[in-house]
Structures are given as C-alpha cells and as structure tokens.
C-alpha cells in the first residue's frame, strides 16, 4: 500500500478525495479504494437516488479543503435502473471546484449523453469532466472496447502517460524519451484493439440510428407494465424505487414462497432458464455495498456472511435476480418475460425437490440433468446441419410462449399433488445465515 509510505499528516492534507455514489458498480468503487485517494460515499435519499443535500454537505466539509476533489457517480444503477440527476450533480460539484465524472455503463445504451449542456443560469456549470463506458450492454456490444471521454482541461501533460510503453512515444534515446503530445495516442499503449474499437463505434451508431426517444418510449412501456403486474403478486419484492419514471429498463427482484421464506436468487434464474429459456442474472450484480442497503444487511451480519464465504460456502451470499426489458422486445416477448416471472414467483417453490443445491457455489442442478454438453470447436461449427437461421413470426412466437407457460403449469400441478419434498435447514451459524428454502 503506497499510502503506508507517506506521512499520515501529509497524506491527510494532500490526499485526493473521491465522492462516490450509493449504488456504484464495483468497477467505480474498488478502483478508487485501491488508489491513493480517500473515498467518501454519498447517501441515498428518500427516493432511492443520490442525496444532493448530503453531497453538498460533504463538499463544504473543511476536512476536504485544499485537496483535489472528484465526484465519480453512476449515471444509473445497474441493479435497480435508478437514474441519477447527472446535470444537478455536475453543477453542484463544479460549484465547489470538484471534478464531475460519471460511469455510464448501465444506461449509455438507452439515454442521451451530453457532456456540455447549456447552463441554466449565469455561473452554472453542468458540464461533465469525464465519462467512462463499457459498451457490453449495447445491442451488439459484447466484445467491444471500453470508452473513456474526458475534457482536455483536466489532463496534465507534464506527467507521463498512464502506461508508458510502445505507441506512446515520439522518440526514445539511450536514457530518456519524448512522449507523444496528442493525448489520445499517448494514452493508447501497445497494439490497439482495432476490431474492438470499430465494434464500439458501430454499436453507438446503432443507438443513434434508432434514436433515444424510440428506445426510451419502448423501455418505459415495458417497465411500466412489468412493475404494475408484479406489484399484484405478493410473492415478488422489486428492489428500489418502483417509480418507472426514475428507471431505465433494469429490474431486480426477490421471491418469497408461501411460508414467507425466500427462494434462492440462483434458483430463480435456473427456473426461468429451464422452463422458459429466459436468461437472467443472479447475484449482487457487482454492486455489493448497494446490496447491503437494498437487503438491509448490517455490519455484524455482513461479517458473518464474509466468514461463511471464506470457509467456502459462497452459496450463502445474498443477492437477487435481475432481468432486462429491452427495447428490441415487442409486447409479446416482454409479456412472456413478465408472465414467466409471475409463474416462478407463484409456483417456483413446488420445483425445489427437483433440484440439488451446491453450498460451495450456489449452483442449482436438476437431478435428472445429464448427457454430453454440446461441443465448442471449429469442427462442430462447420459440421452443423441446422441450416440458415429463420425469424419466427409473431403468431408462432405467441403460440410457443403459451405452450411453454402451459407446460410449466402442468408440471407445477403434478408436483402440487405429490408429497412435498422435505426442506433442509443448515445447522449452527450457517443455519442462521440461510435465508432461502431448499
């Protein structure tokens, strides 16, 4: 830790301070924690968004006077889809001389990004100093390169590049070197990922071609319908503020069974996959600190979970199931996802006896699962005889959706008439941490 090499008093006076939000992705929190900067977290307000009053109080705190101050916030939560008031946060940070940086990974595919909006009044500065985007959430984005955009005024040319290597220099002598003056080139060490960069550019073009108005309208309609219908199901607990106007189309939820006990989040994802072919994500979505708040996990309980994980019991980690309602979905497909989640919340507990739980990994495996997995190789790809892919008509898709839902209900009805599987409770401290039925 380089901080140990510095005098504590000197460090306290000169150490940069980074204000981070209450719903950061790990990439916008752990990277700051591991730097020489001090990180200070801004609270949630009553509406589940960044508390601007608390942020202003921190900016006025004399402990942070005469130190470089940076605000680094998610433009939206990748867990609940909650959108940050980027303009208000930027204006507030600049009012006190701090830099305004935003992680746009969760919402860049769906919203406009304006780094230089018009000021609302004289002296207002709502500009953004830097944004960072991982475009993997864009349509066609997986495998594209990350994007960093920043205002030239915050770049210190007197310092060497972030990574000094090939491609960053104009000339290298026997004992010294001259770095390239052009910022973008001097910050691209080594051989660039050309295809990945081209792919990143193309996915932004797709977004622009469709238009954020179209994207926002479609996703808002899907989100409104999902939240409205799931609110009628007492077994579903949607995380975060349920107001669809405050969100992008990302929804995380948990499910309780008839006895009030939770179904494990990874069990939910397995049922959605096995019964309906719907891919969802289970876990904490790389947002552990936010998860503590959403799930009301206090520090002593958190330490107990940490101890269990260190002992190899990763399956005990709390979390949620996350689904996305994307703008490319038509109403039939969005309704299918909504209906499938409702089914799992209503009938999922009947399927517990069909699955084995691995406490070490949290994996749920069907007891009759078996057979060889499909081969992943060039030979297998070239040998396929599946023919050309075809687009299914709306009528055929609706027919298939109804069929899958009916088949799932038929299985649930059969299981309901069979003797209930005996539920298992872990012993000792592990039992105290067991929040789910199995």
Regions found by a protein language model. Give the residues of each.
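Active-site C-terminal subdomain of aminotransferase-like
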Residues: 136-227
């Amino acid at each position: 830790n380089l901080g140990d090499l510095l005098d504590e008093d000197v460090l306290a006076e000169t150490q940069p301070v980074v204000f981070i939000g209450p719903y950061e992705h790990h990439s916008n929190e752990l990277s700051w924690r591991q730097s020489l900067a001090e990180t200070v977290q801004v609270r949630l307000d009553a509406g589940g968004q960044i508390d601007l009053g608390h942020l202003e109080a921190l900016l006025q705190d004399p402990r942070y006077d005469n130190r470089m101050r940076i605000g680094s916030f998610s433009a939206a939560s990748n867990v609940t889809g909650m959108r940050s008031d980027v303009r208000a946060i930027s204006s507030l940070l600049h009012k006190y001389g701090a830099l305004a940086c935003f992680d746009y990974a969760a919402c860049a595919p769906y919203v406009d990004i304006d780094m230089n909006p018009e000021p609302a009044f004289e002296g207002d500065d709502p500009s953004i100093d830097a944004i960072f985007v991982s475009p993997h959430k864009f349509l066609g984005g997986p495998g594209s390169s990350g994007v960093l955009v920043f205002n030239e005024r915050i770049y210190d040319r007197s310092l060497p590049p972030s990574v000094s290597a090939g491609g960053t220099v104009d000339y290298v002598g026997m004992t010294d070197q001259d770095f390239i003056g052009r910022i973008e080139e001097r910050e691209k060490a080594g051989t660039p990922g050309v295809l990945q960069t081209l792919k990143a550019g193309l996915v932004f073009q797709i977004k622009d071609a469709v238009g954020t108005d179209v994207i926002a309208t479609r996703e808002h309609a899907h989100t409104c319908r999902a939240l409205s219908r799931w609110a009628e199901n007492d077994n579903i607990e949607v995380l975060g503020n349920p107001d669809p106007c405050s969100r992008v189309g990302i929804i995380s939820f948990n499910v309780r069974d008839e006895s009030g006990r939770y179904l494990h989040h990874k069990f939910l994802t397995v049922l959605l996959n096995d019964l309906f072919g719907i891919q969802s994500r289970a876990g904490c979505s790389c947002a552990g600190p936010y998860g503590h708040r959403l799930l009301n996990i206090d520090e002593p309980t958190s330490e107990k979970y940490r101890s269990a994980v260190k002992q190899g019991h990763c399956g005990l980690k709390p979390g949620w199931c996350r689904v996305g309602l994307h703008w490319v979905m038509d109403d039939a497909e969005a309704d299918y996802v909504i209906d499938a989640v409702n089914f799992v919340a209503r009938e999922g507990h009947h399927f517990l006896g069909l699955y084995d739980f691995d406490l070490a990994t949290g994996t749920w495996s069907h007891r009759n699962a078996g057979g060889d997995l499909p081969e992943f190789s060039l030979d297998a790809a070239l040998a396929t005889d599946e023919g050309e892919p075809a687009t299914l008509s709306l009528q055929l898709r609706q027919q298939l959706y109804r069929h899958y839902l009916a088949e799932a209900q038929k299985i649930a009805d059969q299981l309901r008439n069979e003797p209930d599987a005996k539920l298992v409770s872990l012993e000792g401290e592990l039992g105290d941490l067991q929040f789910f039925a199995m």
